[in-house]
Every structure is written in C-alpha cells, then in structure tokens.
Amino acid sequence: MTASSVLLHTGQKMPLIGLGTWKSEPGQVKAAIKHALSAGYRHIDCASVYGNETEIGEALKESVGSGKAVPREELFVTSKLWNTKHHPEDVEPALRKTLADLQLEYLDLYLMHWPYAFERGDNPFPKNADGTVRYDSTHYKETWKALEVLVAKGLVKALGLSNFNSRQIDDVLSVASVRPAVLQVECHPYLAQNELIAHCHARGLEVTAYSPLGSSDRAWRHPDEPVLLEEPVVLALAEKHGRSPAQILLRWQVQRKVICIPKSINPSRILQNIQVFDFTFSPEEMKQLDALNKNWRYIVPMITVDGKRVPRDAGHPLYPFNDPY
C-alpha cells in the first residue's frame, strides 16, 4: 500500500490524487466536487480562469468546515493566478476574488498559472484585431515577490508554479524568500517529464501532473494524435491487473511520487480514479510504461490568427516549451 500523500517542504501533506476542474462546466462541477469528497478525495485543483470557482465554492460551503462532512484542515485546495493579474498591484485582489468565490479563508497552494503576463484587466484573453494576444511586460520574478506577501498575510500556505521550465524555476528560486513548493505541468507516459521531475525534486519541489490521462476532450484536439487511453501497453496492464486504463496511468504516476489531478464529472470514474493505492507495479511493469515516452505534448494553447490555428504564445520570450525541459 503506497502512502496517499507527499510532504511539501512547508510541512503540509498534499494528497497524491486530486480532482481536476479544468473543462468542468458550471452546472456539473458542484456535483462532481461533492461526489469526490464523499469518495475520499481531499485535494481539489482549481483556477480562476476555469470560470467555475463560484460553483466550486457552493459545494465547499455545503461540505467543508466545522460540523460538516470534511473539516477544512483535512482539505487541500489549489488555485492559480491568471496571466492578466501578474502586475504586483493585481496579485492580492486576484487571490481575494478567488477566496471569495471559493468561500474560503485561505488556500493551501497558489500557483502562477503561466510564466508570461497578458495585458492587465478583466478580460482573461485580451486580443489584438488579428487574433494575437496582447501581452504585458511584467516579469514573473516581480509577480513572485507579490505572491510572497500573501503567505506573510496568512492567505496562502504554499506557493508554486505551473507551466514553467527548469531555467525559469531556477530563476524564481534566485529571488525567492518563499520557495516554490510545487510545479504543475502536463505529464503522462507520452510526456514523462523525467528530467524536469528530477530537477524539481533536487530543489525541494513536488510535481503535479495535469492531463494525466492525455486530455482527449480538448477543443483543439488533432484527429491524428495518439490516444493514451488506447495505448496497447496500458490496455494490457489494465487487463492483467483487472483495472481501468485510467487507473493504470494514475498508478504509474503515484508510484513515481507524482501528484495527479484527473478531471471527471462522472461519479463512477471519480471513484475509480482514487482507487490506485491498493495495487503496485513491478519494476518491469514500470519500465514498460516509462518506455512509452515520446515527449508528446497535448496541451499547447492554440488561437486563430488570420484564419489559421497557431500556438498562442510560442513567440513570447518567456514561452516555456522551447527549452528541452
């Protein structure tokens, strides 16, 4: 039986399986949170840009707190600072909006969602006439210093990064008085992220995998892309262990001590996704899954510019995915 959480350098325990809420529609996410809490989840991953924190807050208000089903101190809640709120003056108001929406007094973890800043304001995707994004020059190191104030004020217990590469992580560490505790990135057997995970672990950061099942429900999905849940190695292990393909993918991660936040609104899949602590893979089975790595990235935000689909931010100097890791 594997431990079901990792210890952050802050002393907090972070559950290895959490419920992801990206692409969970309002009208569905409240029920999903309640199903997850009753299935034993104690980790919820949110973000202001997902547009559903108000409804998540309704579920938390009904289920979490003194005299409710789940004591607040048993729940680990993550949210993320969006790109339009990187200016130091905008950081605390953005967090306070998230806290108000989630109906919480503090967050367990607050992540910078991306390394680059968009133009300030309340439109999450400010665009030029040709469809390209309008950026802001605020550097993530300035944003980080503003995030540190939130810890001092007791509004956030730990800070972290999302979609940063190894060089950018070290850049943040060079100015940090509050060290990042977690890096959240896309990660699954097709994008194993071994170098990046080793880099993080050597510096005291834990790693959370988003889209651990391969994210086949994205709007910009390519018809020819590989489908992770149909990978023959995964299907063979699922049959051998009497498990679902999703459980195979999640077990591989938790056995590597990588946190996962699979998104689901389906009660039976929500339950299935946390039932990964009562079986283990042999070293040979882990090697079979490790061998699937092809550095295949599903999550590259796309936009339409002059009628063509192009990566949204690939030309930005702080775009994280041009480096090897």
UniProtKB/Swiss-Prot annotation:
<dbReference type="InterPro" id="IPR044481">
    <property type="entry name" value="AKR1A"/>
</dbReference>
<feature type="binding site">
    <location>
        <position position="263"/>
    </location>
    <ligand>
        <name>NADP(+)</name>
    </ligand>
</feature>
<dbReference type="GO" id="GO:0047655">
    <property type="term" value="F:allyl-alcohol dehydrogenase activity"/>
</dbReference>
<dbReference type="GO" id="GO:0160163">
    <property type="term" value="F:S-nitrosoglutathione reductase (NADPH) activity"/>
</dbReference>
<dbReference type="GO" id="GO:0016324">
    <property type="term" value="C:apical plasma membrane"/>
</dbReference>
<dbReference type="GO" id="GO:0110095">
    <property type="term" value="P:cellular detoxification of aldehyde"/>
</dbReference>
<feature type="modified residue" description="Phosphoserine">
    <location>
        <position position="211"/>
    </location>
</feature>
<dbReference type="GO" id="GO:0042840">
    <property type="term" value="P:D-glucuronate catabolic process"/>
</dbReference>
<dbReference type="GO" id="GO:0045202">
    <property type="term" value="C:synapse"/>
</dbReference>
<dbReference type="GO" id="GO:1990002">
    <property type="term" value="F:methylglyoxal reductase (NADPH) (acetol producing) activity"/>
</dbReference>
<dbReference type="GO" id="GO:0047939">
    <property type="term" value="F:L-glucuronate reductase activity"/>
</dbReference>
<keyword id="KW-0560">Oxidoreductase</keyword>
<feature type="binding site">
    <location>
        <position position="265"/>
    </location>
    <ligand>
        <name>NADP(+)</name>
    </ligand>
</feature>
<feature type="binding site">
    <location>
        <position position="21"/>
    </location>
    <ligand>
        <name>NADP(+)</name>
    </ligand>
</feature>
<dbReference type="GO" id="GO:0044597">
    <property type="term" value="P:daunorubicin metabolic process"/>
</dbReference>
<dbReference type="GO" id="GO:0043066">
    <property type="term" value="P:negative regulation of apoptotic process"/>
</dbReference>
<dbReference type="InterPro" id="IPR020471">
    <property type="entry name" value="AKR"/>
</dbReference>
<feature type="binding site">
    <location>
        <position position="215"/>
    </location>
    <ligand>
        <name>NADP(+)</name>
    </ligand>
</feature>
<dbReference type="GO" id="GO:0004032">
    <property type="term" value="F:aldose reductase (NADPH) activity"/>
</dbReference>
<dbReference type="GO" id="GO:0047956">
    <property type="term" value="F:glycerol dehydrogenase (NADP+) activity"/>
</dbReference>
<comment type="similarity">
    <text>Belongs to the aldo/keto reductase family.</text>
</comment>
<feature type="binding site">
    <location>
        <position position="45"/>
    </location>
    <ligand>
        <name>NADP(+)</name>
    </ligand>
</feature>
<feature type="binding site">
    <location>
        <position position="163"/>
    </location>
    <ligand>
        <name>NADP(+)</name>
    </ligand>
</feature>
<feature type="site" description="Lowers pKa of active site Tyr">
    <location>
        <position position="80"/>
    </location>
</feature>
<feature type="binding site">
    <location>
        <position position="211"/>
    </location>
    <ligand>
        <name>NADP(+)</name>
    </ligand>
</feature>
<feature type="active site" description="Proton donor">
    <location>
        <position position="50"/>
    </location>
</feature>
<feature type="binding site">
    <location>
        <position position="272"/>
    </location>
    <ligand>
        <name>NADP(+)</name>
    </ligand>
</feature>
<feature type="modified residue" description="N-acetylthreonine">
    <location>
        <position position="2"/>
    </location>
</feature>
<feature type="binding site">
    <location>
        <begin position="11"/>
        <end position="20"/>
    </location>
    <ligand>
        <name>NADP(+)</name>
    </ligand>
</feature>
<dbReference type="GO" id="GO:0006629">
    <property type="term" value="P:lipid metabolic process"/>
</dbReference>
<feature type="modified residue" description="Phosphoserine">
    <location>
        <position position="38"/>
    </location>
</feature>
<dbReference type="GO" id="GO:0005829">
    <property type="term" value="C:cytosol"/>
</dbReference>
<feature type="binding site">
    <location>
        <position position="269"/>
    </location>
    <ligand>
        <name>NADP(+)</name>
    </ligand>
</feature>
<feature type="binding site">
    <location>
        <position position="162"/>
    </location>
    <ligand>
        <name>NADP(+)</name>
    </ligand>
</feature>
<feature type="modified residue" description="N6-acetyllysine; alternate">
    <location>
        <position position="127"/>
    </location>
</feature>
<dbReference type="Pfam" id="PF00248">
    <property type="entry name" value="Aldo_ket_red"/>
</dbReference>
<dbReference type="GO" id="GO:0019853">
    <property type="term" value="P:L-ascorbic acid biosynthetic process"/>
</dbReference>
<dbReference type="GO" id="GO:0044598">
    <property type="term" value="P:doxorubicin metabolic process"/>
</dbReference>
<dbReference type="GO" id="GO:0046185">
    <property type="term" value="P:aldehyde catabolic process"/>
</dbReference>
<keyword id="KW-0963">Cytoplasm</keyword>
<keyword id="KW-0007">Acetylation</keyword>
<feature type="modified residue" description="Phosphoserine">
    <location>
        <position position="4"/>
    </location>
</feature>
